[in-house]
Amino acid sequence: MSSHVPADMINLRLILVSGKTKEFLFSPNDSASDIAKHVYDNWPMDWEEEQVSSPNILRLIYQGRFLHGNVTLGALKLPFGKTTVMHLVARETLPEPNSQGQRNREKTGESNCCVIL
């Protein structure tokens, strides 16, 4: 599909945890929730083993970050007419914005300084 992407659309290559991939065309106005619903409603036959019970548990990961449902592709400044790769995972909830490691670092009260002579 990536051989011809309309100039006003964004081609998403979605990768499952299993490594299976599929490409879908979306508008820049489509949100992560819209994408999850579209993929759920058009679940590829070769992804049958990974079929989920609801579109509400499908999550997109882009550049190492989970996308919240209301984030649009346009807001991510994805290039039109090109293919962008994202991961698609089944997960009930999104992780907290601060990881446990970040919270632990904040609680230590240590500070680092650099002395330049």
Curated annotation (Swiss-Prot):
Q: Which UniProt keywords apply?
A: Cell membrane, Lipoprotein, Membrane, Methylation, Palmitate, Prenylation
Locate the Cysteine methyl ester modifications and list their residues: C114
Q: What is its main location?
A: membrane
Membrane topology, as annotated? Lipid-anchor
Q: Which residues form the propeptide?
A: 115-117
Q: Name one GO cellular component term.
A: plasma membrane
Determine if Cell membrane is one of this entry's keywords. Answer: yes
Q: Where is the lipid attached (S-palmitoyl cysteine)?
A: C113
Q: Where is the Ubiquitin-like domain?
A: 10-88
PROSITE patterns xrefs: UBIQUITIN_2
Alphabetical list of SUPFAM superfamilies matching this protein: Ubiquitin-like
- Lipid sites, type S-geranylgeranyl cysteine: C114
PANTHER family on file:
UBIQUITIN-LIKE PROTEIN 3, UBIQUITIN-LIKE PROTEIN 3 HCG-1 PROTEIN
Protein name according to UniProt: Ubiquitin-like protein 3
